[in-house]
Amino acid sequence: MSRTVFCARLNKEADGLDFQLYPGELGKRIFDNISKEAWGQWQHKQTMLINEKKLNMMDPEHRKLLETEMVNFLFEGKEVHIEGYTPPSK
């Protein structure tokens, strides 16, 4: 049976992550407060950020930037701004 959490990003009860995906205290906070759906949204944004800003995950400054964007997106409700990206029209 899947576990449910009150998702801080979506502001609703939703399926929680199956296991802690990120290390440390931040990882515990994500595991306890972020749903699978919100994590999937973050993964999509993260991929766009890495590609568009040409981030190198071996660079500690790039990892810190990505972590800051992740916290802003998941817990503070801020959207990720990707310069030059225009979402497809529906």
UniProtKB/Swiss-Prot annotation:
Transmembrane segments: none
GO biological process: cellular response to oxidative stress
Keyword presence, Transmembrane: no
InterPro entries: Fe_traffick_prot_YggX (IPR007457), Fe_traffick_prot_YggX_sf (IPR036766)
Gene3D superfamilies hit by this protein: Fe(II) trafficking protein YggX
Keywords assigned by UniProt, alphabetized: Iron
Origin: domain of life: Bacteria
Any one Gene Ontology cellular component term annotated for this protein: cytosol
PANTHER family (alphabetical): FE(2+)-TRAFFICKING PROTEIN-RELATED (PTHR36965:SF1)
Biological role: Could be a mediator in iron transactions between iron acquisition and iron-requiring processes, such as synthesis and/or repair of Fe-S clusters in biosynthetic enzymes.
Name of the protein this chain belongs to: Probable Fe(2+)-trafficking protein
